[in-house]
């Protein structure tokens, strides 16, 4: 805990989010912008609010997020992971519910590298028998 802020780091794909939460009115600020402005798609905003909705703290915390790297989906997932860890830092009794929903586990899926001689990671050149 830093002062009266609780901290959590979240990661997803190539995105990293640093999340600070404190008791407040429910404001979520991502990279200096309100969450509704930062995430253009509704799915991104929904993903960010999932841990708060699950624990019933949707209007209880002010959240400040700094997120770098990746795209919109990766950043939303990183913010969700960070908020989850910050909530656990605030109150460890929330961990079982968050674990049950699968928010505590870091999604380890990464982009597979392109291999030499192939078009993409697994896509080969079309085979011609004749």
UniProtKB/Swiss-Prot annotation:
A molecular function (GO) held by this record is:
RNA binding
Q: Note the InterPro entries from the entry.
A: Ribosomal_Su5_D2-typ_SF, Ribosomal_uS9, Ribosomal_uS9_bac/plastid, Ribosomal_uS9_CS, Ribsml_uS5_D2-typ_fold_subgr
Record's keyword terms, sorted: Ribonucleoprotein, Ribosomal protein
Q: Which SUPFAM superfamilies match?
A: Ribosomal protein S5 domain 2-like (SSF54211)
The record's section on Pfam families has: Ribosomal_S9
Which GO terms of type biological process are on file?
translation
Asked if the record carries the keyword Ribosomal protein, the reply is yes
A GO cellular component annotation in the UniProt record: cytosolic small ribosomal subunit
Q: Which residues form a coiled coil?
A: none
Entry similarity comment: Belongs to the universal ribosomal protein uS9 family.
UniProt cross-references to PANTHER family, sorted A to Z: RIBOSOMAL PROTEIN S9, SMALL RIBOSOMAL SUBUNIT PROTEIN US9M
Name this polypeptide is given: Small ribosomal subunit protein uS9
Which source organism? Bordetella avium (strain 197N)
